[in-house]
Amino acid sequence: QQLSDAKIRIAAKTNCSKFIAYFQSYTNTYAPVAYLCSIYEEALQSPEIVALSIGTRSDCLGEDVLLLLSELQEKYPHKQIWIELGLQTMHNDTLQKMNTHTTVEQFDSAIDALTRIHIPVIAHVILGFPNETKEMMLQTISHVSRLPVSGIKLQLLHVLKNTELGNRYLEKPFPVMELMPYCDLVIDCLELLPPDLVVHRLTGDGPRNLLLAPLWSTDKKRVLNTIHHRLKERDTWQGRLFIS
């Protein structure tokens, strides 16, 4: 039903007739394999669906899930199956402070496993963790640039209500990224990435009713326009500083 509703909503805004089924929220491989198979196949069997994008964690890709993904890829050769894998940062101390309970080593291992079964991976990276410097964030981007991933999503850190990070912010506000430094950081990231790597996202807009900071991020069009403007001003491009 969610899929049908989404197709109707999108078709009303555009002339699209083909869609990507995006299992985004939470961890979409954390369930019994039989159940995962049923919901994935329900999407793949729809003639309008051309790809399946599954968001998950590096510690939720057991052998049974990998086998399922491999089997579905063989069963539906004309449709694409992607995994969106959360790295967030390569710095384990940050991951520990953010309570992700994952490590960069787990992420790299998951990349290896997915590469072996020819499943494309989109790496998800968060920019703006409170304890991270610009150099640390660019180290994460350089790390991703050396991995066999097919795409990347760059996500600005959002501080949201009713979260541990949000509670910390309300008790003792910490610095969050401002618009111009963020846009320039995104461009620095693009320069380090392979020129042929697909960039699926340059920012994000958190739910307005929950967002504590940074409030400028709600104007996504302004953020994207600023990035494009700064690219021209700096006369630079994706891959300019990439070293293979």
Question: What is the meaning of each model-derived region?
Answer:
Residues 25-38, 51-117, 127-147, 165-180:
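Conserved non-cysteine loop/helix-boundary elements of the Radical SAM core domain that shape
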Residues 151, 159-244:
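Auxiliary Fe-S-binding modules of radical SAM enzymes
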Residues 56, 156, 206:
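Residues that line or immediately flank small-molecule/substrate-binding pockets and catalytic motifs
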Residues 1-21, 34, 38, 45, ...:
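Conserved alpha-helical substructure of the radical SAM core
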Residues 41, 67, 187:
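Active-site phosphate/pyrophosphate- and oxyanion-stabilizing loops and adjacent acidic/basic residues
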Residues 19-21, 50-54, 81-85, 121-125, ...:
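Hydrophobic faces of well-ordered beta-strands that scaffold small-molecule active sites
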Residues 40-49, 139-153, 224-238:
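Structural recognition of alpha->loop->beta junctions
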Residues 46-49, 110-121, 147, 185-197:
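A structural motif corresponding to the C-terminal end of an alpha-helix
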